[in-house]
Amino acid sequence: MQSKHILLSCLLAAGIMSCKKNEIDPLPLKDLDNTTNVKIVHASAYLTNYSVHLKVNDQRITNAFTYSTPFPGGGLNTGGSNFPWYFALTPGQSKITLAVPNVGRVTDSIMLYTGNVTLDAGKYYSVYLADTLTKTQAVVVPENKAIPADKTTRFKFVNLIPNVAAIDLYFAGNVVAANIPFKGVSPEFILPYTTAGQWAIRPAGAAPTTTALAIYPSGTTNQTIPNQRIMTVYSRGYNGITTGNRVPAISLLYN
């Protein structure tokens, strides 16, 4: 077995063989000594919403799924599940591949991204694949897994919209993360349990009365802040697109 092996005893059984499309979570793996813990988020907004698969160190780890789905786990306004799961890897450098597979096979048909990331032992990471074509990049974000205080939830914001200089994130009409550039990560912030409101993104410095690039949830629906969760808000898509798969959007990832 390769030295950069993936700990897939549960994943192969539960993640590939028995899962339906976009239901790709493996059983959670233990935080073993000398492992690193990872989730990968497909946030590359193509005009066509391809069915894709992920490989790590040339080993397929998912069945077919679509934009914007995390693996493993899920979130709000994403594919996937409602769980904050990660998978375990041997620490060090690992190769990540996102590709459109040949129909009915594990081989790659259209390569969307391949590149290396370096991950340390004993830590948790979310790896976001952002932008498209030759500009696709892996944005590696370390995770703080400390449980928040009772009656609070801890957030951070990751900006994955390439064609805006920087973004301000709002919740319930208030700026909670300011001037975050593409691939930037905000400082963590705390919101009180049961607070209700909508998320919105605007170009950095824009007045709060200007039209938002995106709002979540849509319409008059609010999100109510849960208790003692760890979540990442991330923006995706492209500014100026008004229809289809590439419109600006807000998603929340369970960490």
What do the predicted segments below correspond to?
Residues 1-19:
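Sec-dependent bacterial lipoprotein signal peptides
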Residues 19-255:
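Intrinsically disordered, low-complexity polar regions and short flexible loop motifs
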